[in-house]
């Protein structure tokens, strides 16, 4: 691709994923702006860019950024798995995502999914205990929703508990013992004290005391797909609602067939969520470059 990205004056050059909605015209008074398909960005194209505004389609790693002028990356998404944070830190490249931008949309999806499941099973949600794993932007809204329904709510968030004290938090072990429904709202952390990659594995199911419904609207890699399928086959769990899958877009079709509700990572896909993500990205770029937007 021979797109010209060389700056013609002293203004910053910002390359923007052309699928990000509601952004055209917002930055042009303050910077040179180039709109391109995010999946087509290459090292040659971004070489002279000062900033990127991306979605998850653009893998921001050494392969793309090495030798470039990029100083800042804004992702108009909650997720930031596509940004190599360690590489950016070493190279002095700042970045920002858009946490909570679509939390309301995910919460609406969760409400619809739970009500659909309850009607299908002819059960009353207010008679059940729900465990919420991850009590951030989405998890907090989920807790408010479930309290409003009349459910008993158990909250597990080790990082928040470490920072804030025990408060209303409990342990994942207690959730595994008492919850009729367990819903996950955590980022993917592959290592460290608070690792979440494959936190739902064979060991997770061995400690269950009930036969809960599992819900995943966060990240596919939080679930070990093989372990989840085994749990469904053995009756260790009563059902599965899943919006986020391992190895997207090459999802496990066998697991899809076993779900009570399976969707294509659309829980947070809404106009208002996209608009807020765009706004947060513009503000992040403005703060970094002192544009005054």
Task: Kindly give the residue locations of the regions a language model identified.
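C-terminal helix-to-coil terminal segments
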Residues: 97-101, 105, 190, 248-293
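Phosphate-coordination loops involved in phosphoryl transfer and adenosine-cofactor binding
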Residues: 10-11, 126-129, 202, 211
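NAD(P)-binding Rossmann-fold cofactor-contacting core
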Residues: 21, 148-165
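N-terminal glycine-/charge-rich "phosphate-binding" loop or analogous flexible N-terminal tail
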Residues: 1-49, 154
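Rossmann-like adenosine-cofactor binding region
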Residues: 59-61, 160-253
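Phosphate/diphosphate ligand-binding glycine-rich loop within oxidoreductases
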Residues: 50-122
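Glycine-rich adenosine-cofactor-binding loop
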Residues: 99, 107, 126-147
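Oxidoreductase and adenylate-handling cofactor-binding alpha/beta cores
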Residues: 107-123, 148-151, 279-287, 292
């Amino acid at each position: 691709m021979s797109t010209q990205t060389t700056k013609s004056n002293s203004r910053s050059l910002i390359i923007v994923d052309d699928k990000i909605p509601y952004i055209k015209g917002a930055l042009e008074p303050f910077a040179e702006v180039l709109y391109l398909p995010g999946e087509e960005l290459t090292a040659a194209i971004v070489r002279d860019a000062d900033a990127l505004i991306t979605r998850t389609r653009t893998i921001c790693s050494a392969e793309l950024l090495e030798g470039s002028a990029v100083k800042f990356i804004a992702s108009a998404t909650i997720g930031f798995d596509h940004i190599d944070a360690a590489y950016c830190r070493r190279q002095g490249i700042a970045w920002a995502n858009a946490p909570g931008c679509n939390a309301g949309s995910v919460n609406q999806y969760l409400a619809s999914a739970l009500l659909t499941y309850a009607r299908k099973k002819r059960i009353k949600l207010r008679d059940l205990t729900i465990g919420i794993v991850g009590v951030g932007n989405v998890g907090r809204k989920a807790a408010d929703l479930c309290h409003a329904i009349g459910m008993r709510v158990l909250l597990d968030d080790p990082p928040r508990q470490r920072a804030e004290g025990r408060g209303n938090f409990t342990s994942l072990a207690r959730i595994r013992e008492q919850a009729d429904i367990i819903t996950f709202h955590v980022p993917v952390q592959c290592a460290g004290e608070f690792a979440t990659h494959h936190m739902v594995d064979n060991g997770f199911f061995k400690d269950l005391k009930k036969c809960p419904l599992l819900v995943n609207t966060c990240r596919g890699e939080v679930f070990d797909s093989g372990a989840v399928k085994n749990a469904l086959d053995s009756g260790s769990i009563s059902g599965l609602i899943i919006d986020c899958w391992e190895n997207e877009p090459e999802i496990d079709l066998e697991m899809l067939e076993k779900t009570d509700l399976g969707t294509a990572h659309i829980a947070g896909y809404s106009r208002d969520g996209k608009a807020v993500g765009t706004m947060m990205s513009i503000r992040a770029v403005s703060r970094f470059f002192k544009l005054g937007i």
